[in-house]
Amino acid sequence: MNVRDYLTADEIAGLTRRSDLRAAWIVLCQWLQVAALFAAMGIWPHPLTIVPGILLLGGRQLGFGILVHECGHRTLFRSQRFNDLVGDWLAAAPTFNNMRAYIRGHLVHHRKAGTTEDPDLPNYRDYPISRERLARKLKRDFTGQTGMRTLRGLGRAIAGLPSLSEEARAAVVRGIVVNLALLGLFTALGAAWLYLVWVVAYVFVQPAISRIRQVSEHAAVPDLLDPDPRRNTRTIRANYLWRGLFSPHDINFHLEHHLMASVPIYHLRRMHRLLAERGAYDGIDFPDNHLDLLRRVTHGPAGPAPA
């Protein structure tokens, strides 16, 4: 599919135009939502605030990952300098992410999507899978097995800091600085325990949310090996609640992102509407939410299968 068959040159120029104001607002809202969750738990420390707070923080941690994705593509802000600065410090560092390492692999995924050379293919090639198999995967996530592997890897990176590459070392140092700043802030406010909540969300919730987000984008699509993104990638028409948890910052419009990766996230919704109005999506059945998605990527009981 060629988007130029459906969009004018002026529309494409508008869709790919960056806005520093909108980008700054998205980053600010991301941090304000995190702050609001911590404030609610700190002011009213009760299971009725802490348990939902941990779940929502897992979604916000994915939100930081989406900002890393956008800054890595150089599409959030107009200047490369701002994309790098915000991506490194305000998006990647809170979860010890390495934006440059991430985007190198991600760009290969964009070039090779729809082929057997897609580096992300093993993550969703087997779908649809049985509900029992998906439940086992999510059980590993929610019991911390997946997150603890990540945490152990981070521990090894910190212990071996001098031996890391300059790029990797800088990413780890930024993560240490930002996380120590969070711990220091909570300690100064007399609520150091809130940092533990951040870690718990990272270990026990964020892996499951990230898995569902990844499944939503490419699993059980019409044809993983078709070069047309309409066949190998999916968009979900989800409401605010579903998007906030599993597809923050409009990343649920993933088909549009694969059709034209130069479009910032704050224009993807408009791009989807334009293409839908002009028949580009005729015959495509978009899931209404992530529960609908999970029904589509799973099937009934099956025999023994790999985890």
Please give the residue ranges for each predicted region.
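Cytosolic juxtamembrane regulatory segments of multi-pass membrane proteins
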Residues: 231-250
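Aspartate-rich (DDxxD/NDxxD/DxxxD) Mg2+/diphosphate-binding motifs
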Residues: 67-86, 117-124
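Transmembrane alpha-helical segments that form the membrane-embedded catalytic/substrate-channel core
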Residues: 58-68, 100, 138, 145-150, ...
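Membrane-cytosol interface motif
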Residues: 84, 88-89, 224-236
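Histidine-centered catalytic micro-motifs
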Residues: 64-73, 102-114, 213-220, 247-263
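Active-site-flanking alpha-helical
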Residues: 37, 72, 76-77, 225, ...
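Non-catalytic, topology-defining segments of multipass membrane proteins
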Residues: 1-58, 67, 92-197, 265-307
